[in-house]
Amino acid sequence: MSNMDPNSVLPKRSFLQHELFSQLHIPGSLAFEAFSCISKFTGALLCWFSHGNLQKEVSKHQWGLTCKSRDSLKHVFEHRNVSVFPFHYVSKDISPGFFGNISKSTIQHFVNEAERLHSCSLLSLAAAMIPSLNVMSANGLALPLGSNDVKLRENIEHRTCPENTEHRTCQVGCEEYSGLSFQKLDWTRQSVEPRTGIEFPMLLKENASRSNSEVLVATGSRTMKIIRIKSLKVYAFGFYVHPSSVCQKLGRKYASVPASKLDKCDDLYKDLLREDIVMSVRLVVNYNGLKINTVRDVFEKSLRARLVKANPKTDFNCLNDFGSFFRQDIPIPAGTIIDFRRTEDGQLITEIGGNLIGAVRSKDLCRAFFGMYIGDVPVSEQTKEEIGRKVVGIIKRC
């Protein structure tokens, strides 16, 4: 029994992960000792209840025992099946006191064993039930360690931030943004857009601190259908906002509003567009056959419709200037990075492959462009909601 393999007792993927076994194992097999104690105690009780009949049988032969009488006595004990009990009867006079002493001794031994086992504290038991750090999954931690995916999960429960706490925490996406965890977040890691597998940096500016760079709040992708059969993943995009700009423009207005009410608040998205908050969209081309003039035509068509809806008397010169940046001689193979950035003074700056290709000063054009992602009929409704949740988390930390 002492050589029994622990794996045969506890499954390899059991809840305790062998920790409880390794912490509470005592040589000699506790199960066997407990069974032995119970067996002795039961035997003593049975002997006590049967001692009256045994004494009567013995008293008939206790005077002048002959060989024959001794054989009869042996027959009596064999008939009573006394040999099954772990006691040896060596006394001629078997009295109630004899069995009483045995029972008392057995009970005392059983109590002592129970007290000895009780010395294993509940604290040790609790410690044994907690898995070791090396077998804990990253999902069980407050912040993901080394995880590349910071996309939201639809089934995550959103909690309202308690008021007047030192480190307020909001569940935004799959990360908890609190005063402590946000500071320790690994901003050097990449976030992966799941459909295309394209990576986006958490900070838009390389080698920049969180205080002077836009941070990633959502990723998404644009898909086009070809002949209603094949879906073409044209590009992936990452949406960035500047936390300081968000706090400065929206912090006071929404600080007292519960996060649960801001989750799908249309006014929040309208204010993000109206208040000239610093934000950027990074596009990464995912299709080798994409042409620069195709990108220009798609943007001009969408922007024109949004400008007309916002203000029918809009000056479209800003749109013409924007379209002129996309010249025929600019190659955009798969992997090309195109950045669009809005500044506080209302400029829309365009960069391709890290090179500045132009800037247009027009607040209407900026609002129309970023309205494609957080306005009416966005590129991705799911990404828009994710942006809203992450911005709410930033506001609650202002």
UniProtKB/Swiss-Prot annotation:
Q: List the keywords (alphabetical).
A: Chloroplast, Plastid
Family per record: Belongs to the chalcone isomerase family.
* Entry GO CC: chloroplast stroma
Q: Which domain of life is it from?
A: Eukaryota
The main location is: plastid
The record's listing under SUPFAM superfamilies reads:
Chalcone isomerase
Q: Name one GO molecular function term.
A: intramolecular lyase activity
> Where is the protein localized?
Plastid, Chloroplast stroma
- Which sites bind dodecanoate? R222, Y235, S302
Null mutant phenotype reads: No visible phenotype during vegetative growth.
Give the gene name. FAP2
Q: Does the keyword Plastid apply?
A: yes
- Please tell me in which tissues this protein is expressed: Expressed in developing cotyledons, young seedlings, roots, seeds, embryos, macrospores, preanthesis and tapetum. Restricted to developing and reproductive tissues.
Job description of the protein: Fatty-acid-binding protein. Associates with saturated fatty acid.
Quote the InterPro entries the UniProt record gives: Chalcone_isomerase, Chalcone_isomerase_3-sand, Chalcone_isomerase_bundle_sf, Chalcone_isomerase_sf
Q: Which organism is it from?
A: Arabidopsis thaliana
Q: What is the name of the protein in this document?
A: Fatty-acid-binding protein 2
